[in-house]
Amino acid sequence: MSSLAADQRADGRIDFVGSVRPTVGVEWEFALVDATTRDLSNEAASVIAEIGENPRVHKELLRNTVEVVTGICANAGEAMEDLASTLRPVREVVRERGMDLFCAGTHPFADWSVQKLTDAPRYAELIKRTQWWGRQMLIWGVHVHVGVSSAHKVMPIITALLHQYPHLLALSASSPYWDGEDTGYASNRAMMFQQLPTAGLPFHFQEWREFERFVSDQKKTGIIDHMNEIRWDIRPSPHLGTIEVRIFDGVSNLHELSALVALTHCLIVDLDRRLDAGESLPVMPPWHVQENKWRAARYGLDAIIILDADSNERLVTEDLDDLLERLQPVAKRLSCVEELSRVPDIYHNGASYQRQRRVAEEHDGDLRAVVDALVSELVL
């Protein structure tokens, strides 16, 4: 699902093709791992070639990665069915070639320096500009698109959604390891990805015109050539009429993914409806947003997060309990009550970063066992 493909008009305006309904779509990145060694396999091109033309299966920056995307869906349940139907034949092709599908924010022991770049001008240009940091982007994530009706709502919703940034990152955190070492972080991916010059947290804009001026400035100064080079953790997708949430580490299974998609869908639709009701959405000071991102990346579900401009704090899982209760009416309207109810399973059973560390401990630090465990979680 290509994002931000629409470009600016000569007058600097960016058309946002509003969504009539609050639809949802998902992009899910997978790594290919060798069935025996559990190291990464740079065979995505041959896998995609064997699958043939399929608008639901895409190549990515590195040759060890395939991305599976949905169409336009009504809710999280429909999106999961869409993904599963695409993944079944993809996994069959992958297994026939002696590999497995793997998803986490990072691979626990792979060497980033030996990974191969997908042959495409935009990827070559990215590496040419970003050099060492760009070559280290051995990371995988999930992107969730939610339809929004009008451009004037987009920036207030994105800015307000930053209140829930740490909740979403902590729940999905799945990248404790890097190059064979435990980083001490729940999400090392979040710290890695923000090193790219146009990645990281979005600016606190309130008006669509501010975003248009920002894009114009970025192009005028040569920072970007196209809007898809804006790699914010939450960004507008004008040609799709969506807000794209890119906070999540890679997710290994449909159960957790359905919960995260439902939560994201409900959060954005709730903010959209509050705007319709004439409410001014809350704004978190950017220094608190930045700190919350770091706390969630470092401590995951044990993070004490900052709640508001008054600097009140709370354990993220306690705040999630209240948030889920508040979103119940929205979930009923979107027919995703069941999927939203799975969110507490993540912090009751352990998030991916916690499960990975448990497996490593049980196997005397053998990180191949971590890959085994993550691969086995993908039940279709």
From Swiss-Prot:
Any one Pfam family match given in the protein's UniProt record, by short name: GCS2
Record carries keyword Ribosomal protein: no
InterPro entries: GCL_type2/YbdK_subfam (IPR050141), GCS2 (IPR006336), Gln_synth/guanido_kin_cat_dom (IPR014746), YbdK (IPR011793)
Domain of life: Bacteria
Keywords: ATP-binding, Ligase, Nucleotide-binding
Gene Ontology BP annotations: modified amino acid biosynthetic process
Alphabetized GO MF terms: ATP binding; glutamate-cysteine ligase activity
EC number: 6.3.2.2
Chemical reaction(s) catalysed: L-cysteine + L-glutamate + ATP = gamma-L-glutamyl-L-cysteine + ADP + phosphate + H(+)
PANTHER family (alphabetical): GLUTAMATE--CYSTEINE LIGASE 2-RELATED (PTHR36510:SF1)
Biological role: ATP-dependent carboxylate-amine ligase which exhibits weak glutamate--cysteine ligase activity.
Family recorded in the similarity comment: Belongs to the glutamate--cysteine ligase type 2 family. YbdK subfamily.
Protein name: Putative glutamate--cysteine ligase 2-1
Species in which this protein is naturally found: Mycolicibacterium vanbaalenii (strain DSM 7251 / JCM 13017 / BCRC 16820 / KCTC 9966 / NRRL B-24157 / PYR-1) (Mycobacterium vanbaalenii)
